[in-house]
UniProtKB/Swiss-Prot annotation:
Pathway(s) of this molecule: Purine metabolism; AMP biosynthesis via salvage pathway; AMP from adenine: step 1/1
Organism of origin: Hydrogenovibrio crunogenus (strain DSM 25203 / XCL-2) (Thiomicrospira crunogena)
Swiss-Prot/TrEMBL catalytic activity: AMP + diphosphate = 5-phospho-alpha-D-ribose 1-diphosphate + adenine
Protein name (database record): Adenine phosphoribosyltransferase
EC number: 2.4.2.7
Enzyme class: transferase
GO cellular component terms given for this protein: cytoplasm
Length: 172
């Protein structure tokens, strides 16, 4: 598979945050190619799909970057999925597995609107899966999921028949 041109700007960092993990650092993309990155993520969905979406949901913390920028670009609202203790009036929470441990996410009550969930990178799919389940639990309808980088070798995640759309994929 031909890789997206933005892939060349990722920086692979071995043994971060723990030994045995090859971390894909998106910092160079954010610093030097942010507009191109948001444009590429925007193209993951058609104009018709964007027209039907009400909110972009960002998964803490790097998902906030992409969801808020896409929300601004497409004149949509922004909703946060946060780690414990960061939101008032939490309606639901969920624990999930990471490539290197476990964590927990929380959300406020939703309102039945349609959402696209955004994150920076999907490894095992744990945080995206938790965010999708939380969105449904609090009252949102998940109509799409997007990330910048998908480490496909570590996951086969889908939610209600939807797979995560990504700009950059690594199969090994």
């Amino acid at each position: 598979m031909k890789q997206h041109p933005l892939a060349q700007y990722l920086e692979a960092v071995p043994d971060f945050p723990k030994e045995g993990i090859l971390f894909q650092d998106i910092s160079p993309l954010l610093r030097d190619h942010f507009v191109a990155t948001i444009d590429a993520m925007s193209l993951l969905f058609s104009a018709k799909e964007w027209a039907e979406v009400d909110y972009l949901v960002g998964v803490e913390s790097r998902g906030f970057i992409f969801a808020s920028a896409l929300a601004l670009k497409h004149d949509k609202g922004f909703v946060k999925v946060r780690k414990p203790g960061k939101l008032p009036n939490v309606h639901a929470s969920m624990e999930y597995g990471l490539e290197y441990g476990t964590d927990k996410l929380e959300m406020q009550k939703g309102n039945g609107k349609k959402v696209i969930i955004c994150d920076d990178l999907i490894a095992t799919g744990g945080s995206m899966q938790a965010a999708a389940k939380l969105c449904n639990e609090v009252g949102y309808e998940v109509v799409g999921m997007a990330c910048l980088v998908d480490l496909k070798a570590l996951n086969s995640f889908s939610h209600d028949g939807m797979t995560v759309r990504s700009v950059i994929q690594f199969d090994d």
